[in-house]
Amino acid sequence: MKTFVRRLAAVLTAALLCFNLYYELAPGYVVGPEWKIAFAAGFAALLGVSLFYGVPKSARGTRRHDYMMLLLWYYLWVLANVLFFDNAFGRGFHPSMDFGAVNLEPLRTIKNYLIAYGYGNISLRLVILNLLGNLVAFAPLGVLLPALFRWQRSIFFFAATLTLGITAVEVAQVYTGAGSCDVDDLILNLAGALIVFVFCRITPIWKHICAVNPRPKKG
């Protein structure tokens, strides 16, 4: 029975992933943030059941690593879609190298959003989508990277990796015309990931993160 449940969950995981891919990529469909979260939660839950349901703890070692790696690849696909292709966020390729879309003044965009909301020029939903969305966009990496890669358990290497990666994304968005290059995006993206990293680091969660890819035993 337990094997049947795991196999059924695996089939449902694949079906959900195909459904998710179709609606994200099919022209004419716009998948909002709420549905993206629902798809991600469903994928993570079903994948977890397919890998762990009824499996003894002693046999879960490699499965933990596989689970986190599959979550990382799914997350990276969702992130790339949101940043470069997603109609829900006005993405698309329009190569132009428009340097007018570059902001290197820290907190300028954040301040402008808050001022515009204060004057009633934009909705609270737009403020949350842009500011809170940027804060949580890279936050999952605060768990996934240190779980999968031992060298990412150093906050210095983790922050350096994220800074380089986010900067590359910002430059690519300007080059492709998919978005702007904004230092405030870097600040919010990095802050969100670091908050999750530090929270895990100072709580018992860190022990479970390290168990995904433990250090080799000496001897």
Model-derived features: where do they sit?
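Bulky hydrophobic segments
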Residues: M1-G177, F197-G219
